């Protein structure tokens, strides 16, 4: 069974969409299920009337990238590069709301956004 607790959430309010990483206890590290969920969220945002997509983390970290332990456990390839490309190609303007530390692949994800801004934690 797939653990859906802590999957990234999507909220669309008016013309602003927000994807929020929900794993502050592990520095918002992303696993394969998270990547799939974010891809679905990006498809939803691209099909919506949103003009802005904000990506943010919860807690004191923005994102620490992909959970490489999932690769060691025999899981399929991460797909992280495809996620970064999807963010770069996203129709709305993308903003990384950096609420704290950005590590590993989280740096690539932030750089894939059109803008990066520091926000209070």
Residue ranges and their predicted role:
Residues 22, 66, 99:
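Histidine-centered beta-alpha loop that forms part of the nucleotide-sugar donor binding/catalytic region
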Residues 1-58:
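Conserved CoA-thioester-binding segment of acyl-CoA-metabolizing enzymes
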Residues 87-121:
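Glycine-rich beta-to-alpha active-site loop
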Residues 36, 57-89, 102:
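Glycine- (often His-adjacent) and acidic-residue-rich active-site loop
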Residues 19, 55, 67, 109-111:
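Hydrophobic/aromatic residues within transmembrane alpha-helices
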Residues 29-32, 73, 112:
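Phosphate-coordinating loops and pocket residues in cytosolic domains that bind phosphorylated ligands
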């Amino acid at each position: 069974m797939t653990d859906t607790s802590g999957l990234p959430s999507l909220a669309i309010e008016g013309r602003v969409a927000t994807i929020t990483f929900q794993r502050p206890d592990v520095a918002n590290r992303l696993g394969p299920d998270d990547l799939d969920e974010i891809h679905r969220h990006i498809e939803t945002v691209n099909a919506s009337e949103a003009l802005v997509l904000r990506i943010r983390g919860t807690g004191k970290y923005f994102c620490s990238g992909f959970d490489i332990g999932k690769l060691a456990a025999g899981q399929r390839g991460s797909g992280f590069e495809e996620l970064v490309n999807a963010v770069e190609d996203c129709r709305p303007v993308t903003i990384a709301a950096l609420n704290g530390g950005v590590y590993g692949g989280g740096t690539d994800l932030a750089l894939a956004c059109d803008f990066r801004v520091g926000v209070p934690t």
